[in-house]
Structures are given as structure tokens and as C-alpha cells.
A protein has these predicted regions:
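Conserved ABC ATPase "signature" region
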Residues: 101, 105-129
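Short, charged/small-residue-rich alpha-helical element at the C-terminal edge
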Residues: 229-302, 307
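Conserved ABC ATPase signature
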Residues: 133-137
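ABC transporter nucleotide-binding domain
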Residues: 176-262
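Catalytic Walker B motif of ABC-type/P-loop ATPase nucleotide-binding domains
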Residues: 158-162
Length: 307
């Protein structure tokens, strides 16, 4: 990894009046990473992205993109960064091709950028929409144009803020495939998403943000490995599930349960033996390891309990 992070966040805080949106956040995203920024609604993810992109001024701390301070050297920092916003922001009267060429011009890119724009249109399946006005596009097509806008100046660092929000399954798959292509070609990618199974599949490292603070930064593999639970799904007949298991059980159907078992104190064999001793006949059984969603819920619930 390069000693200079792609994104270097140092002691960043942001307050809106009496509300603390970010509280002394430190975060480094390394060059070449596909990094996930995860958290519940209102956790501070979009505020942090706004500060990184220069759209929001931090109350305290500093941010650098590829070593360029976003305040002291903001022009170079912004040229190094492409951001796909969560909201659909566009001029309804411009054609798609004009929107992209104007966006390139903001970064000092002239006609030499047009072949790259054509390539983006092709890759994002927008070629037949190049002369359509933005207001005439579907929500999914507008989302594709926003992605193209973020890439017209070939930024080495790309931030995708909920890029698949409100899109159908087919487009979601297309966008994630494109994110993988960008990453494979050398881009550093930072994404936020509520589809945690996709973050687990795509990202090498993730940060979980809650109440304006970084709860954890780790590889997805390490996060999953240190989760203290495993899950047992059982279909029972005869006696119902014993009361002692109910606080850690979730009903999945008629006398079908998923039990959340502590790895260190509840060995699988002992649990099955206790069920049989209680008169339960086990009709079906399946186990699963924790997912990133399980870890996410565990960490954010801990924060809620502390609060």
C-alpha cells in the first residue's frame, strides 16, 4: 500500500448548532482499496462525504485527498475526486451529452475528453440517450448519468454515495459490475450502501459509523471472524421451544426458529441435546455463519444500549 492514503481524515468534527453530526473522526482509505462506509440513517456518512468532497466545511479537523488538503489545496483535491451523490441532482433541460461535456469543462477538460465521455455512455448503456434531456429519463437512467458525471475528469478516487438507491435489481447488478471494473483499473472506490450483503462481497475493508463516530474499521474477514455468535435454524415438532432459548430465538415459521448461539458457551451438540431432553423432535436443522449484516446490527445495537 502507498504511504500516502487516498483519503486521509484526521480529527474531523461537524456540528450543526447543538447537533454533533461527526465527532473527532479519524479514517484512512488506502490507494487501490474498495472501501465500504456503512451505518444506519443519520449516522453521519453523507456529512463525512460532503466534507471530503468540499461541499461541507468541517467544524474541526482536516481531510486530504491523495495528500492534497481539501481546504488549503482544494482545486487539486477536487480534481482527484469524483462523487456520485445520493440525491438525483441535475438540470432538467440539458441533454445528456451536454451535461457530461459541461461537467468535464468544469475540470478544465475540453474536446480531448469527448472520446472518454463516449466510452462512459457506452459502458453505462446510455448511448441511445445521449441526445435526450435529463427530465425525460427514468430514475435509473438519471442515476447512470450522475455516475458518468463523476467520472468525466478521470478521477483516481471515486466516492459512490448510495449509488443503487431506488434502482431495480438489473441496474444494481450493472452498477456493481461497473464498480468492480473501475477498481480493477486502479481506481480507489469508497461506497456507502444499505445492501450489506453487497458490501460484504465487494469491499476488502469497511468502516461502521454510528452517532457520528467510527465504531470499527476492519477487513470484512476479520469482522466476521471475531463475531461471537453462530446461528442455528431448527424445525421442531412435539414439545415447543424451551423458554430458556426464547430470548435468543427468532420465529421463522410454525415452530421453526433461528437461534443465536454464543460460540464459547453454547456448543452445537449441547444445544441439540437440551432440545431433545425438553421433548423436542428435530425435523430439520441448518447452521450459518454470521454475515456482515449480523455484525452491523450487533455493533449499532451496542451503541444504542450505551446511549
Amino acid at each position: 500500500m502507498s504511504p500516502t492514503p487516498a483519503i486521509d481524515v484526521r480529527g474531523v468534527s461537524k456540528r450543526f448548532g447543538t447537533l454533533t453530526a461527526l465527532d473527532n473522526v479519524d479514517l484512512q482509505v488506502w490507494r487501490g482499496e474498495l472501501f465500504g462506509l456503512l451505518g444506519p440513517n443519520g449516522a453521519g456518512k453523507s456529512t463525512l462525504i460532503g466534507i471530503i468532497s468540499g461541499l461541507v466545511r468541517a467544524t474541526g479537523g482536516s481531510v486530504a485527498v491523495l495528500g492534497h488538503d481539501t481546504v488549503q489545496d482544494f482545486r487539486t483535491a477536487r480534481r482527484s475526486l469524483g462523487v456520485v451523490p445520493q440525491e438525483l441532482v441535475f438540470d432538467p433541460f440539458f441533454k445528456v451529452i451536454d451535461t457530461l461535456r459541461l461537467q468535464a469543462g468544469y475540470y478544465g477538460c475540453g474536446r480531448e475528453a469527448w472520446p472518454w465521455i463516449d466510452e462512459l455512455l457506452e459502458r453505462l448503456e446510455l448511448t441511445d440517450k445521449r441526445h435526450a434531456t435529463m427530465r425525460g429519463l427514468s430514475g435509473g437512467m438519471k442515476r447512470r448519468v450522475l455516475i458518468a458525471q463523476a467520472l468525466v475528469h478521470r478521477p483516481p478516487v471515486v466516492v459512490l454515495d448510495e449509488p443503487t438507491a431506488g434502482v431495480d435489481v438489473e441496474l444494481r447488478r450493472t452498477l456493481w459490475a461497473f464498480a468492480r471494473e473501475l477498481h480493477a483499473s486502479g481506481h480507489t472506490i469508497v461506497l456507502t450502501t444499505h445492501y450489506l450483503e453487497e458490501a460484504e462481497d465487494l469491499c476488502s475493508r469497511v468502516a461502521i459509523v454510528d452517532h457520528g463516530r467510527i465504531k470499527v474499521v476492519s477487513t470484512t474477514r476479520e469482522l466476521l471472524a471475531r463475531h461471537p455468535f453462530r446461528f442455528l435454524r431448527v424445525s421442531l415438532s412435539g414439545a415447543p421451544l424451551p423458554e430458556r432459548f426464547r430470548p435468543q430465538a427468532e420465529a421463522c415459521g410454525d415452530n421453526e426458529w433461528e437461534l443465536k448461539l454464543d460460540r464459547s458457551t453454547q456448543p452445537l451438540g449441547r444445544v441439540l441435546e437440551e432440545l431433545r431432553d425438553a421433548g423436542c423432535r428435530i425435523e430439520d436443522i441448518a447452521t450459518r455463519e454470521p454475515s456482515l449484516e449480523d455484525v452491523f446490527v450487533e455493533l449499532t445495537e451496542e451503541a444504542a444500549d450505551v446511549a
